[in-house]
Regions:
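Basic phosphate/pyrophosphate-binding loop/patch that engages nucleotide-derived ligands
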Residues: 98-120
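Conserved alpha-helical substructure of the radical SAM core
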Residues: 1-78, 82-86
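Active-site beta-loop-alpha junctions enriched in small/polar residues
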Residues: 37-39, 68-70, 92-94, 118-121
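Short, charged/polar "capping" segments at the starts of alpha-helices
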Residues: 72-75, 95-102
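Accessory C-terminal segments flanking Radical SAM cores
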Residues: 130-201
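Non-cysteine beta-strand/loop elements that form the S-adenosyl-L-methionine
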Residues: 84-95
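Short beta-strand segments
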Residues: 31-36, 64-67, 90-91, 153, ...
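Acidic/histidine-rich catalytic cores of soluble enzymes
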Residues: 115-131
């Protein structure tokens, strides 16, 4: 996918949490997901990010992590345990996913597994055109547009869609006035909402 492989810098992360804090105060921030295209646990300050995120959203809101399991060992699970994230493990590498799931389950952190690439495949809103013939994901309503979810990209831009691999759905930046961030359908006939397996509400 056409995204540069970089880590979010700490200042951008703090600004993103300020945006989250605004929506927590508004009463509309019901959960937070620390995930993305790529492996979130590769970030050198990942455990700190989880801790800071939990401090902002409190213990009563869902904090979700997705991982391919390569870095989720007993030590990582132990470090994450105080913050009670809900961890989903991808089954792309079963031989790595199994021990990761054991480590997360032992700490009460395993929320589920992800085998969507095999049993609920999609084409990343047209970004993976070669997957289009294999799309088997259900034609559900897009929760990003329906519930007002957004994605913060690595550079702090705020996007409408988690499947937007090139920034086409950007509506602003984490340092913008939150009231100006309006999510909307995006893309053209080949990339974006029109090419997605989900329905625009």
């Amino acid at each position: 996918l056409p995204r540069e492989k970089v880590d979010m810098d700490w200042d951008t992360f703090v600004a993103a949490l300020d945006l989250v804090r605004f929506f927590v105060r508004q009463g509309t921030q019901t959960e937070l997901s620390l995930t993305g295209i790529g492996e979130s646990m590769l970030h050198p300050r990942f455990v700190e990010m989880v801790a800071e995120s939990r401090a902002v959203i409190g213990m009563g809101r869902l904090l979700t992590i997705t991982t391919n399991g390569l870095l989720l060992d007993d030590a990582m699970a132990e470090a994450l345990e105080p913050f009670k994230p809900a961890i989903f493990v991808s089954l792309h590498r079963p031989e790595k996913a199994a021990p990761a799931m054991v480590a997360a389950r032992k700490r009460g952190l395993l929320a589920g597994r992800n085998a969507a690439f095999a049993d609920s495949a999609f084409n990343w809103a047209g970004h993976q055109e070669n997957w289009t013939p294999m799309v088997s994901a259900p034609n559900i309503k897009c929760e990003f547009l329906n519930a007002g979810w957004c994605v913060v990209l690595v550079d702090g831009r705020v996007a409408t869609c988690c499947l937007d691999a090139d920034g086409s759905s950007v509506v602003g930046h984490v340092r913008d006035d939150p009231e100006t961030l309006t999510l909307k359908p995006w893309g053209d006939a080949k990339i974006g909402c029109s090419a997605c397996h989900m329905q625009v509400p």
